Amino acid sequence: MILNARPEPIAFPTSASALIVVDMQNAYASEGGYLDLAGFDVSATAPIITNIKRAITAARAAGIQVIFFQNGWDPQYVEAGGEGSPNWHKSNALKTMRKQPELMGKLLAKGDWDYALVDELQPQAGDIVIAKPRYSGFFNTQLDSILRAKGIHHLIFTGIATNVCVESTLRDGFFFEYFGVVLEDATHQAGPDFAQKAALYNIETFFGWVSDVETFCNCIAPSAQLSQSA
């Protein structure tokens, strides 16, 4: 298959590709979730959820592996690291809870509403769900071994936040020899609009490719696969 993308089209075999859904949790996409409580704007996430759902449906129909990430830690936050970890100092979730102690145990804690995937994007049989304790989906997870065992080397990214966990995972994948593509209208930034633009610029210039949901879905549709193989 040939996917139209920036800065140039990229060939990818559906059997060796995975659609990555990054952190589509209440924490990042819902009012009352961590990002919202930390002061980030989540008002524009509804169309992102719709676009991701469309990409997931198309990927499943084409036989592309769907992988969901969930970012967070145990309820005691041992996995978050203590003061000896830079994560303790830089995580906005941890900083928000230190400022508002009544939120302790409620933000990004496994088993809580904040940690849960949004209702619209629920895994189905055959999908893979991976818990991750840091921005990158490759850090302290089984992602790399799962992908290699399945012969997957092309990763199509969706999710939140483009400039944090999406970009971090794609960058790490680049260093592990994975081809990374971001569907720009199925991602959303944490912060101002320029954060989205900067992340996409970095990706398409240095680490991967950028496409969109319409192009992706049309590319992997059965009719498109038949025409490209003819």
UniProtKB/Swiss-Prot annotation:
Biological source species: Yersinia enterocolitica serotype O:8 / biotype 1B (strain NCTC 13174 / 8081)
Its annotated function is as follows: Hydrolyzes ureidoacrylate to form aminoacrylate and carbamate. The carbamate hydrolyzes spontaneously, thereby releasing one of the nitrogen atoms of the pyrimidine ring as ammonia and one of its carbon atoms as CO2.
- Matching PANTHER family: ISOCHORISMATASE-LIKE DOMAIN-CONTAINING PROTEIN, PEROXYUREIDOACRYLATE/UREIDOACRYLATE AMIDOHYDROLASE-RELATED
Know the name of this protein? Ureidoacrylate amidohydrolase RutB
Catalytic reactions on record: (Z)-3-ureidoacrylate + H2O + H(+) = (Z)-3-aminoacrylate + NH4(+) + CO2; (Z)-3-ureidoacrylate + H2O = (Z)-3-aminoacrylate + carbamate + H(+); (Z)-2-methylureidoacrylate + H2O + H(+) = (Z)-2-methylaminoacrylate + NH4(+) + CO2
GO biological process terms, alphabetically, are:
nitrogen utilization; uracil catabolic process
| Protein biosynthesis among keywords | no
* Origin organism lineage: Bacteria, Pseudomonadati, Pseudomonadota, Gammaproteobacteria, Enterobacterales
Q: Where is the active site?
A: D23, K132, C165
Give the InterPro entries listed for this entry: Isochorismatase-like_dom, Isochorismatase-like_hydrls, Isochorismatase-like_sf, RutB
* Keyword set includes Metal-binding: no
The EC number(s) attached to this protein equal 3.5.1.110
Q: Give the enzyme's main class according to its UniProt record, as a single word.
A: hydrolase
Keywords (alphabetical) are:
Hydrolase
Family of the protein in this entry = Belongs to the isochorismatase family. RutB subfamily.
Molecular functions per Gene Ontology: hydrolase activity, acting on carbon-nitrogen (but not peptide) bonds, in linear amides
